[in-house]
UniProtKB/Swiss-Prot annotation:
It comes from Acholeplasma laidlawii (strain PG-8A). Consists of two distinct domains, a catalytic core and a N-terminal extension that is involved in tRNA binding. Belongs to the class-II aminoacyl-tRNA synthetase family. Type-1 seryl-tRNA synthetase subfamily. Pfam families: Seryl_tRNA_N (PF02403), tRNA-synt_2b (PF00587). This is Serine--tRNA ligase. GO terms for molecular function: ATP binding; serine-tRNA ligase activity. The gene is serS. Keywords: Aminoacyl-tRNA synthetase, ATP-binding, Cytoplasm, Ligase, Nucleotide-binding, Protein biosynthesis. Catalyzes the attachment of serine to tRNA(Ser). Is also able to aminoacylate tRNA(Sec) with serine, to form the misacylated tRNA L-seryl-tRNA(Sec), which will be further converted into selenocysteinyl-tRNA(Sec). Homodimer. The tRNA molecule binds across the dimer. GO terms for biological process: selenocysteine biosynthetic process; seryl-tRNA aminoacylation.
Length: 423
């Protein structure tokens, strides 16, 4: 959520920057009028309460002097009836303001490229050497089905499209990737490992910015105010909702493994084949809570941590900065890591690393104090894929395939797999 004071004091700049995300935000000028009306009503309430206190003192004095105070009592009663009406009006104004603020996306950072969609994204780095095959390359679906490690037909029978059954060494490979990612982030990069709930409530979804915009993408549990977790970002950010963090505890960084669930309501017809875009998928997520002055460095560190997974797997990738029109709703700046997939002969997203600054912290009311007597401030929150497990599995299968259809296990995964080849 954006700061109302900042919006009203910098309205032209805010509208200009939000417009780069797509759409017209000129209607935000009405927030200035609403804010002024709010201040006026608050002053009116405060003035009436001050008068009520004065009259109460006057009544006390009159009674001590054994004089008639009925005329002053009438004034107090009049004020008592006026204040609730004004407080009701104030509540209505606050509701109007909150309805505007809750649907506003985050303001893009100054160095984010301006553009309407992914075509304006800017590549800033490439890593690794793309392998040149001397045989016809297969995609992960062909490889997985031929090796009997991915079963799409039975998954569709069990549930429906966009699901898969991992079998045998396929299941072991997915588990190996999860453990390898968590071990690397926990032991090498210093993140604290957590396994949060896979079910979250309505407040948690609003706090991180999933709601209201992406409500159609969520799976709701009928009869409950609960939703299946769309990303570990949601439960992990909400660990500190409505809390004040000790300054000495910052920065806080977690690595969280969850299964994620998404309806993919806006993705009809896209990536329907294979495990690239599914309703249920495993994901290792990185989360940081940082002081405002430290969040940019925290963002760079998180990006490097996520990149390290692919470097250790020795799989080519590139990093792009997302444009204003391609960024997520609650993010101020996002890097995408795109892995090379020989089966598609292109780079595909395998993880996003984002800085939300104080946007989520305001929605979730997550604050910190620099000292005992200091005023509270909002923390900055950051999140990143570390990585999407299914897409990493695709990258391993396609980049490490052999002419006979077998898959060579990357060196770093051999201790987890117990075999050197899937065949």
């Amino acid at each position: 959520m954006l700061d109302l004071k900042y919006i009203t004091e910098n309205i032209d700049e805010v509208i200009l920057k939000l417009n780069t995300r797509g759409g017209d935000f000129s209607h935000l000028r009405q927030l200035i009028d609403l804010q002024e009306e709010r201040k006026s009503v608050i002053k009116e309430v405060e003035d009436l309460k001050a008068k009520r206190n004065e009259y109460s003192k006057e009544i006390g004095e009159l009674k001590r002097q054994k004089q008639d105070a009925s005329h002053v009592l009438l004034k107090v009663e009049s004020i008592k009836s006026d204040i609730p009406a004004l407080e009701l009006k104030l509540g209505e104004i606050d509701e109007k303001i909150n309805k505007e603020l809750i649907v506003l996306p985050n303001i893009p950072a100054d160095d984010v490229p301006v553009g309407k969609d992914e075509s304006a994204n800017i590549e800033i780095k490439k890593w690794g050497t793309i392998r040149h095959f001397d045989f016809e390359v297969k995609d992960h679906t062909q490889l997985g089905e031929a090796l009997n490690i991915l079963d799409f037909e039975r998954a569709t029978k069990i549930t429906g499209p966009r699901f898969v059954v991992d079998k045998g060494l396929g299941a072991r490979l997915e588990r190996a990737l999860i453990n390898f990612m968590i071990d690397t982030h926990a032991y090498t990069h210093g993140y604290t490992e957590i396994i949060p709930p896979f079910i979250v409530n309505d407040k948690s979804m609003y706090a991180t910015g999933q709601f209201p915009k992406f409500k159609e993408d969520a799976f709701k549990l009928e009869g409950f105010d609960w939703y299946l977790n769309p990303t570990a970002e949601v439960p992990t950010i909400n660990l500190f909702r409505d809390e004040i963090i000790d300054n000495d505890a910052l920065p806080i960084q977690y690595v969280a493994y969850t299964t994620a669930f998404r309806s993919e309501a806006g993705s009809a017809g896209r990536d329907t084949k294979g495990i690239l875009r599914q309703h249920q998928f495993n994901k290792v997520e990185l989360i940081k809570f940082a002081r405002p002055e430290d969040s940019e460095q925290a963002h760079q560190d998180m990006l490097a941590n996520s990149e390290r997974i692919l470097q250790l797997l020795n799989i080519p990738y590139r990093v792009v900065v997302l444009s204003t029109g391609d960024m997520g709703f609650g993010m101020s700046k996002t890097y995408d890591i795109e892995v090379w997939l020989p089966g598609q002969n292109m780079y595909r997203e395998i993880g996003s690393i984002s800085n939300a600054r104080d946007f989520q912290a305001r929605r979730a009311n997550i604050r910190f104090k620099r000292s005992k007597d200091a005023k509270t401030e909002y923390v900055h929150t950051l999140n990143g894929s570390g990585l999407a497990v299914g897409r990493t599995m695709i990258a391993v299968l396609e980049n490490y395939q052999n002419q006979d259809g077998s898959i060579t296990i990357p060196e770093v995964l051999k201790p987890y797999m117990g075999v050197e080849v899937i065949k």
